[in-house]
Regions:
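Hydrophobic, lipid-facing positions within transmembrane beta-strands of outer-membrane proteins
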Residues: 12-14, 50-54, 159-165, 240-244, ...
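Sequence/structural signature of outer-membrane beta-barrel proteins
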Residues: 5, 19-23, 39-47, 61, ...
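Short loop/turn motifs that connect adjacent beta-strands in outer-membrane beta-barrel proteins
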Residues: 8, 22-35, 61-68, 172-178, ...
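Transmembrane beta-strand segments that form the barrel wall of outer-membrane beta-barrel proteins
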Residues: 1-4, 26, 30-44, 52, ...
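Gram-negative/organellar outer-membrane beta-barrel architecture
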Residues: 1-234, 243, 338, 422-438
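C-terminal outer-membrane beta-barrel translocator/porin domains of Gram-negative envelope proteins
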Residues: 207-214, 219, 224-235, 239-369
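Short sequence motifs at beta-strands and strand-loop junctions characteristic
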Residues: 6, 46-48, 153-159, 234-238, ...
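Transmembrane beta-strands of outer-membrane beta-barrel proteins
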Residues: 36-40, 66-72, 176-180, 242-244, ...
C-alpha cells in the first residue's frame, strides 16, 4: 500500500487478508464473494501519521440476511489541522510579513505562504509558553533572548484507539439496507504549545549571523479557542456512540458505477449513559447520483455527483465536528482528499456542514498487461461546500469552491487508483490514493 497526501506526506503500509469462502452447498454461496473476511493493516507516513486496523466482515451470518462488521483501529495523527469551528473558518487566511508583530498584514493569504511565514521567529511575550522537563511554563519576561515561532499554530496531535461494530440487514434484493451499531473511542489530544521546534531567523537567515534553530512554539490556535471558551474537548476524552442508518442503493457496480443512486440518512448519539464524556447527536444526509448520458457513443462516460449535509448538536468536542458518520465511510471536515480538494483537510468544520461534488468520468483508453486489465479515466471535477453556526440559516450563498483534474486507473475493474490535482483560491494539492472521491 502506498499513497501521497499534501498534508500527511507519502504513506506506506501493508494489509494482510484472510478469507473463508464457504462451501458450494451453502445457501448463499452464489450471492456473496465470501462468508468471512479478515484483514490486518499497518500504515504510516513520512510525517508519522499512523492508521492501523483489524477488520472483520461476515455477510449472511448464520445463513440469515444479516451482515456483521467489526473494526479495531488506532490512529495517531501529529499532522491534524485546526483552524477553528464554525463560520469564522470561512474567513481568508491572514498573517504578518515575516511573522513580525507590527509588520504589514497579508489578507486573503495562500496556505503555503502562511505556513512558511509562521516558521519565522518572533519576540516572545509573557503569554507565550515554554516546555521544560516535560512541564509547561509561561510568564517568561519579554526580552531579546526569548524568541518563539508559530510553526505549529494550526496543528495538534490526536491519538484515537477505537472499536466499531455494526450490523446490516438488506431488503428488496439489497436495494434497501438498515444499518445499526456502536462506536467506542478514546481521544487523546496533545497540543504543541511550548514545544521546541525548528524555526527560521527572520533577519539573518542564510548568513553566518543566523540564529535559526529550535525555539519554543507559541500558543496555538487550539489553546486560544479553549481559553476563550469557544470549544469543548481540549483535553480529549471518551466518545461512545450508538448509531443507526437507512440506505437506498441502486448502483450497478459499487466500486465504479455507471448508473444508479445512493441515498443514506444516519443518526449518531453520544451519551454519558454509555460512558461517553460528552452528550451530543449528529444527523447526516448524503446523496450520490451516477448517469451515463451517451452509452451507445462512449464506452464509459459518467456524470457523477454527490451532495451532503450534516448537523452536530449538543455538547460536541471540537474534534468531533470533523466526523460525520456514513454507512460506507466517515466524511471528515471539509477539505482534503474527499471534499473541497483544493483546501487542506479540516479547513472548514462547524455545527452544520454542507458540501457537494460534480465529476465527469471518461474512459479514454484500456489495455491488458500479463492478464491484468487496466482502464484509464480522465476526471474533471468541481467541489463546493461551507459551514454554518445555525443550520436554519443554511442557504446557497458564500460557498467555498475548488476545481481540478484527475486520472483514475481502474485495475481489473474493482480497484481504482486515483491521482487528483485540485486548485482553490487558497491552495494547490495533489493526491494519490485508492478509490473514487465518492
Amino acid at each position: 500500500m502506498i499513497n501521497s497526501d499534501p498534508n500527511e506526506g507519502i504513506g506506506y503500509g501493508v494489509r494482510v487478508y484472510g478469507y473463508n469462502n464457504g462451501k458450494k452447498s451453502d445457501p448463499f454461496f452464489e450471492y456473496t464473494p465470501y462468508r468471512l473476511r479478515f484483514f490486518a493493516q499497518y500504515f504510516n507516513t513520512t510525517k508519522n501519521a499512523q492508521y492501523h486496523q483489524l477488520s472483520l466482515d461476515m455477510p449472511y451470518v448464520a445463513n440469515t440476511q444479516w451482515r456483521l462488521r467489526a473494526d479495531a483501529l488506532l490512529t495517531i495523527t501529529p499532522t491534524t489541522l485546526y483552524f477553528g469551528v464554525g463560520e469564522s473558518t470561512l474567513k481568508p487566511l491572514t498573517y504578518h510579513e515575516r511573522n513580525q508583530p507590527g509588520a504589514p498584514q497579508v489578507t486573503n493569504g495562500q496556505y503555503g505562504l502562511q505556513e512558511s511565514t509562521f516558521q519565522y521567529q518572533r519576540p516572545g511575550g509573557s503569554g507565550d509558553p515554554i516546555e521544560l522537563g516535560g512541564r509547561l511554563y509561561s510568564g517568561v519576561s519579554s526580552g531579546p533572548g526569548f524568541n518563539v515561532t508559530d510553526r505549529m499554530y494550526n496543528r495538534y496531535t490526536i491519538q484515537t484507539p477505537q472499536l466499531n461494530f455494526s450490523t446490516e440487514r438488506s431488503f428488496f434484493h439489497g436495494t434497501v439496507r438498515l444499518v445499526a451499531g456502536f462506536r467506542l473511542s478514546n481521544n487523546i489530544v496533545h497540543v504543541n504549545d511550548g514545544k521546541f521546534v525548528k524555526s527560521v531567523d527572520p533577519i539573518f537567515e542564510g548568513t553566518p549571523l543566523s540564529n535559526s534553530g529550535q525555539v519554543p512554539n507559541a500558543k496555538t490556535k487550539l489553546t486560544e479557542d479553549a481559553e476563550a471558551g469557544k470549544i469543548l474537548g481540549y483535553h480529549g476524552g471518551f466518545v461512545n456512540t450508538a448509531k443507526i442508518g437507512l440506505v437506498y442503493d441502486t448502483r450497478d457496480f459499487e466500486p465504479d458505477p455507471n448508473s444508479g443512486v445512493f441515498l443514506e440518512g444516519t443518526y449518531e448519539k453520544a451519551s454519558k449513559t454509555i460512558a461517553s464524556d460528552f452528550d451530543f447527536q449528529k444527523y447526516f444526509g448524503h446523496a450520490k447520483f451516477f448517469y451515463s448520458p451517451f452509452p451507445k457513443t462512449f464506452e464509459k462516460l459518467v456524470l457523477a455527483s454527490r451532495f451532503g449535509f450534516g448537523i452536530s448538536d449538543g455538547n460536541v468536542p471540537f474534534f468531533e465536528y470533523r466526523n460525520l458518520w456514513g454507512t460506507e465511510n466517515t466524511v471528515s471536515g471539509l477539505g482534503g482528499l474527499r471534499t473541497l480538494r483544493g483546501y487542506k483537510q479540516d479547513r472548514f468544520v462547524g455545527r452544520a456542514m454542507g458540501f457537494g461534488t460534480l465529476e465527469l468520468r471518461w474512459k479514454f483508453w484500456s489495455f491488458s498487461v500479463g492478464g491484468e486489465y487496466f482502464a484509464l479515466n480522465l476526471v474533471p471535477f468541481w467541489d463546493f461546500g461551507r459551514v454554518w453556526n445555525d443550520e436554519h440559516k443554511a442557504g446557497l450563498t458564500d460557498y467555498k469552491y475548488s476545481q481540478g483534474l484527475g486520472l483514475r486507473i481502474a485495475w481489473n475493474q474493482a480497484t481504482i487508483i486515483m491521482m487528483d490535482y485540485a486548485v482553490s483560491r487558497e491552495d494547490k494539492q495533489l493526491f494519490v490514493n485508492f478509490s473514487h472521491a465518492f
